[in-house]
Curated annotation (Swiss-Prot):
Organism: Arabidopsis thaliana (Mouse-ear cress)
Cofactor: Mg(2+); Mn(2+)
Domain (PPM-type phosphatase) ranges: 47-337
Pfam families: PP2C
Comment on bound cofactor: Binds 2 magnesium or manganese ions per subunit.
GO molecular function list: metal ion binding; protein serine/threonine phosphatase activity
Protein name: Probable protein phosphatase 2C 65
Region described as Disordered: spans on this chain: 107-126
Amino acid sequence: MGVCCSKGTGIIVEHGADDGNECGDGEAEVRDTNDGAVVRTRGSSKHVSMSIKQGKKGINQDAMTVWENFGGEEDTIFCGVFDGHGPMGHKISRHVCENLPSRVHSKIRSSKSAGDENIENNSSQSQEELFREFEDILVTFFKQIDSELGLDSPYDSFCSGTTAVTVFKQADCLVIANLGHSRAVLGTRSKNSFKAVQLTVDLKPCVQREAERIVSCKGRVFAMEEEPDVYRVWMPDDDCPGLAMSRAFGDFCLKDYGLVCIPDVFCRKVSREDEFVVLATDGIWDVLSNEEVVKVVGSCKDRSVAAEMLVQRAARTWRTKFPASKADDCAVVVLYLNHRPYPREGNVSRAISTISWRSNKSNNECYGAAPLSPLGLSQRVS
């Protein structure tokens, strides 16, 4: 969830009457839009496997969505997972989950109607132009939705917010956008096994350039004595809210102090060896490594239950690894990139993504590596 202490006060995607006790083995939830897209909030298809499970901390604050035929194109798909935090985190994550893809979808449709067709030749320049255009659309709507949360939202987002990690796939092009500490990891074939390629950087206060931005805006970054490895963002004159991420929707108590809503956006061309992308909230990544996640998904004979198997594995690991802790919510979307059979077993090795084009708008340069604690930051002894 990502917040230490909090102040409480579109269309909402509901995931069940108990507001969070669901998992991916339930009945599929699918609806059609008026312009050809198929929106999935639970279940599986030939392209995706989805699963969500409430943790032990209270109401489920995770949300997820998949849009097939995105923008009216049969070979185009949009996937996203969202991890809310704070008293209204469950409302904000679902609000963003519904509104972000719907606005991007409508923008693409309207651009096509106006004659601004997608560039379809294979030249490097034209594909980069497509990426830059889509990056602008994403950043615009990230900022627009965040601004609306602060101005006229029915939800108090002063100390509540959400992460977001999304993947847009068109033909052999992946555009990934990341905000916060949810993560996207690619499973790619290597002989008779898989290797895990981390596509996103966890945007946390311990990433040096993130910390530098926060400190330059008078925010504070430090770890509490009881959690020496978890750096958090604090207001200048108050030990609140203790946010464990450096970018998010909402959390307006920190927006003047270095917290931003500009996503990391980059593009990767899909190779013949690339099999699937796993999008998941930190309830998965806190207990399972990238390699373990890719191995679980790659070993599933029935792709439709891959996300469910991963969520169940994480739940068991929470119980064994952290028996005294409350398990976090988990949301997983597995996007399959092709329909060829692939290996079931074998060792998994870690690799770093090769980015085709990266965002001009992000100030984070620490792609692919586990972030180190920023120089000059210390624990808070209290």
